């Protein structure tokens, strides 16, 4: 049955048929799990809060389950796919399942970790994706860094990763991904996805993470990240140590670390998990106390 907006979403039968046609076996190496449940796809798109003006980038479109639903809601979709067979088939899938929307799709066959602004004819305003699970955090952070135009994010990742990304200071799972994601804005968990909606079914559940990019007191540029990222990494490298000890290598000595911490109005006896991103930016000397 045709969707009211002009796209026929893919179900289990179509997913299997496409995979067989392309001789594609989902691989752990590429972190591939194909969503075959249209209701889950609709839920993801709804959670993304897209407008008809949004230009979406999707990383790892696979066979096109989510892609078909995204073009119904957005002005355009650029799908970044590393697998040449999958990338080549997407336009054909659109001709089959959404012929009236095919002109809204652009496919970029490339590793998402290497994708650049110059690969895009239209700069994206939203990232919506079922991210490859083995590189989900690096891909998420790369896309946020490379495309300042992205103002909203809705990604599906392993549930444990979703919990870590959305963790708040002071919690046991708060760490490097939590701080670096919050560098860009507000991070929250937007739901849990069961195993049964994927083929093949993964070992663990998945989670939805939402990020709304905000205007921060610090520049969200390469120069700022070059100062802040090493401080975050050092603070969590040995997370049971106090910041005075953990940052001694970064600042040259424990006393130098203590001096920097006190200058940033941070207790040197605290551990890294107690600081929010603004503390780390201040500690890196990007903004004043």
Curated annotation (Swiss-Prot):
| Keywords assigned | Cytoplasm, Methyltransferase, RNA-binding, rRNA processing, S-adenosyl-L-methionine, Transferase
This chain's protein is named Ribosomal RNA small subunit methyltransferase A
- Taxonomic superkingdom: Bacteria
The reaction(s) catalysed by this protein are: adenosine(1518)/adenosine(1519) in 16S rRNA + 4 S-adenosyl-L-methionine = N(6)-dimethyladenosine(1518)/N(6)-dimethyladenosine(1519) in 16S rRNA + 4 S-adenosyl-L-homocysteine + 4 H(+)
Cellular component, GO, one term: cytosol
What Enzyme Commission number(s) appear in the record? 2.1.1.182
Q: Which molecular function terms from Gene Ontology are attached?
A: 16S rRNA (adenine(1518)-N(6)/adenine(1519)-N(6))-dimethyltransferase activity; RNA binding
Q: Does the keyword Membrane apply?
A: no
Annotated organism of origin: Corynebacterium efficiens (strain DSM 44549 / YS-314 / AJ 12310 / JCM 11189 / NBRC 100395)
Q: Which family does it belong to?
A: Belongs to the class I-like SAM-binding methyltransferase superfamily. rRNA adenine N(6)-methyltransferase family. RsmA subfamily.
Entry binding sites for S-adenosyl-L-methionine: 33, 35, 60, 81, 111, 130
KW Magnesium (keyword) present: no
Q: Which SUPFAM superfamilies match?
A: S-adenosyl-L-methionine-dependent methyltransferases
**Location in the cell:** Cytoplasm
Which Gene3D superfamilies does this UniProt record tie to the protein?
Ribosomal RNA adenine dimethylase-like, domain 2, Vaccinia Virus protein VP39
What job does the chain carry out?
Answer: Specifically dimethylates two adjacent adenosines (A1518 and A1519) in the loop of a conserved hairpin near the 3'-end of 16S rRNA in the 30S particle. May play a critical role in biogenesis of 30S subunits.
């Amino acid at each position: 049955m045709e969707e009211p907006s002009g796209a026929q979403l893919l179900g289990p039968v179509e997913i299997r048929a496409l995979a067989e046609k392309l001789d594609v076996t989902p691989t752990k190496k590429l972190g591939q799990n194909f969503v075959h449940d249209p209701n889950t796809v609709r839920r993801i798109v709804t959670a993304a809060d897209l407008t008809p003006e949004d230009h979406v980038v999707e990383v790892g479109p696979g066979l096109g389950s989510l892609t078909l639903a995204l073009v119904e809601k957005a002005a355009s979709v650029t799908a970044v796919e590393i697998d040449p067979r999958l990338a080549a088939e997407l336009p054909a899938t659109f001709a089959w399942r959404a012929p009236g929307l095919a002109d809204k799709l652009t496919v970029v066959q490339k590793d998402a970790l290497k994708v650049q602004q110059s690969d895009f004819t239209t700069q994206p305003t939203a990232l919506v994706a079922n991210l490859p699970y083995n590189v989900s955090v690096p891909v998420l952070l790369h896309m946020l860094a490379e495309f300042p135009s992205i103002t909203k994010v809705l990604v599906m990742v392993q549930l444990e990763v979703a919990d870590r990304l959305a963790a708040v200071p002071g919690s046991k799972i708060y760490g490097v991904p939590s701080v670096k994601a919050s560098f860009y804005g507000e991070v929250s968990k937007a739901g849990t996805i069961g195993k049964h909606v994927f083929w093949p079914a993964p070992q663990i559940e998945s989670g939805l993470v939402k990020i709304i990019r905000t205007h921060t007191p610090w520049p969200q540029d390469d120069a700022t990240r070059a100062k802040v990222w090493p401080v975050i990494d050092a603070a969590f490298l040995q997370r049971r140590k106090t910041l005075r000890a953990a940052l001694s290598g970064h600042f040259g000595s424990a006393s130098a670390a203590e001096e920097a911490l006190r200058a940033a109005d941070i207790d040197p006896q605290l551990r890294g998990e107690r600081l929010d991103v603004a503390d780390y930016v201040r500690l890196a000397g990007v903004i004043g106390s």
